[in-house]
């Protein structure tokens, strides 16, 4: 199984909550975190199999755009991220999210 990282950045917290909810409901992914960037920008991060992350990000984009005032600013998927990223960036499976891991 090839593990990927998927990210959606929105303007506004309600949009990112809606996106995150839809992402974990639409595919077998694990929500590993979120980052508040500033100026209302928030990024949500999921991990899972490449195809599942792709489906998850698509569902998240659609959901965030349904929120009144919600705006998707950026999305990206990294297939097979280098293991060094996990030790520097907030994309690793933590103890808090391990119970929700889907694979």
Swiss-Prot record:
One of its GO terms (molecular function) is structural constituent of carboxysome shell. It comes from the Bacteria. Its main location: other. It is found in: Carboxysome. The keyword Membrane does not apply. GO terms for cellular component: carboxysome. GO terms for biological process: carbon fixation; photosynthesis. Keywords: Bacterial microcompartment, Carbon dioxide fixation, Carboxysome, Photosynthesis. The keyword Transmembrane does not apply. It holds the Pfam family BMC. Residues 4-90 form the BMC domain. InterPro entries: Bact_microcomp_CS, BMC_dom, BMC_shell, CcmK, CcmK-like_sf, CcmK/CsoS1_BMC. Belongs to the bacterial microcompartments protein family. CcmK subfamily. PANTHER family: CARBOXYSOME SHELL PROTEIN CCMK4 (PTHR33941:SF13), PROPANEDIOL UTILIZATION PROTEIN PDUA (PTHR33941). One of the shell proteins of the carboxysome, a polyhedral inclusion where RuBisCO (ribulose bisphosphate carboxylase, rbcL-rbcS) is sequestered. The central pore probably regulates metabolite flux. Hexamers make sheets that form the facets of the polyhedral carboxysome. Homohexamer, might also make dodecamers. Interacts with full-length CcmM. Forms mixed heterohexamers of all possible stoichiometries with CcmK1, which might form dodecamers. Only very weak interactions with CcmK3 and CcmK4 were seen. The tight homohexamer forms a pore with an opening of about 5.9 Angstroms in diameter which is positively charged. The C-terminal flexible tail, which is the most variable part of CcmK proteins, seems to be involved in packing of hexamers in layers. This is Carboxysome shell protein CcmK2. It comes from Synechocystis sp. (strain ATCC 27184 / PCC 6803 / Kazusa).
């Amino acid at each position: 199984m090839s593990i990927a990282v998927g990210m959606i950045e929105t303007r506004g917290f309600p949009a990112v909550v809606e996106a995150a909810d839809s992402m974990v409901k639409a595919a077998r992914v694990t929500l590993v975190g979120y980052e508040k960037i500033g100026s209302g920008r928030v990024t949500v991060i999921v991990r899972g199999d490449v195809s599942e992350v792709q489906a998850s990000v698509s569902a998240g984009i659609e959901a965030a755009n349904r929120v009144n005032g919600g705006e998707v600013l950026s999305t990206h998927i990294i297939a097979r991220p280098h293991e060094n990223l996990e030790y520097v960036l907030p994309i690793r499976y933590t103890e808090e999210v391990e119970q929700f891991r889907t694979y």
